[in-house]
Amino acid sequence: MIELSDAHRARVDAAIDRALARLTARCAPHGDGAQALAAAVSASAADGKRLRPALVVASFTAFGGDTAATPALWDVAAAFEILHTALLVHDDLIDRDVERRGILNVAGRFRERAHAYGADDRGTATVADAAAVLAGDLLLFEATRLVATAALTDDERDQLFAVLDEAILVSAVGELADAEHAARADLPDAHALLTAAHDKTAVYSFRAPLRAGAVLAGATSHAALSDAAAALGLAFQLVDDLIGTFGSRRQAGRDPGADLREAKRTPLIALARQTDAWPRVSDALAVAHTGPIAVRRAQREIEASGARVGLEELVHDNLRRARAHASSAELPPQAVVLLAALADAIERRIP
């Protein structure tokens, strides 16, 4: 995708570290539980690809911003990484996951902690859920605080709060829709699943950080940028769905076909349902949780249904839309180059 330079990564990481150190210091007087929560929060924000801060910085420079003259850039970029971490913590809670990237997440850490002091299964689950809710809440506030205290003009701050407000609200709407789709007795249609995929990820991961960078650089018109970024964000999420079904262990960061084993209701599955091959796909999905052989069978049936090609075409449609919006006369040449490069990078991720 897109990466921060070593120097820029160091500036973003320093801003994140300052925010987490502040949280740790504030939790310290409040006892062992608060200290454990601060440690879990810090661990959840460690490492990562820093995609969203990279988009903030790339957009800022593409719209003519001077990184040396804008110290607020690093706090705002860090805010989007902390927002991302908050949403991941809450997403793991909703999905009942206790690990992320093979490492115990906030809930997982507090499950172990509760077991250690003798909690029963119900108490352990309650403590783990509470810790994940509270950790995500603290991170959401910290992301907002970074923008509130950054060295910005009043107008910049107002615009950035509007961007952040939309990102958090739309992500919450998408997360709820995703949870309700998973709970329904019937499989939602492809449009509903596409809308949830867009809302859950595209706004906070692409549109918001790209707009934030443009605001910091003094851009006055964001319509074409917003439209291109929304299309890029949806394409990115759809490629993630393809990776979750067909990607390698290296691409997915977990066992191949994990989405099939976990019976996730993705746009890919909704497209398969619209085909005559659905009975065979459905039968294969019903046993995909049993092991690698069953996963491979489900992969073959989905591919034979044409759903994989159909989803790839949706990815390409959104990338074409993004490139069309990027060609708008209102965008500076470097912003056009940036959006085109992002579209190319997303295309290369297709498994």
Show which residues each predicted segment covers.
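Conserved N-terminal diphosphate/IPP-binding helix and adjacent helical/loop segment
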Residues: 1-80, 85, 89-125, 175-191, ...
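Hydrophobic packing residues in well-ordered alpha-helices of helical domains and bundles
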Residues: 5, 9-12, 73-79, 136, ...
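All-alpha helical catalytic cores of prenyl diphosphate-utilizing isoprenoid enzymes
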Residues: 29, 45-51, 130-141, 148-246
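Residue-level signal for inorganic ion chemistry
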Residues: 55, 143, 269, 322, ...
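Well-ordered alpha-helical scaffold segments within catalytic/enzyme domains
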Residues: 58-64, 143-150, 208-216, 271-276, ...
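Active-site alpha-helical segments that house and flank conserved acidic catalytic motifs
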Residues: 73-101, 165-172, 203, 211-214, ...
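Divalent-cation-assisted or electrostatically stabilized phosphate/pyrophosphate-binding catalytic cores
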Residues: 100-136, 186-203, 249-276, 286-313
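Short hairpin/turn module used for nucleic-acid contact or packing/dimerization
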Residues: 297-351
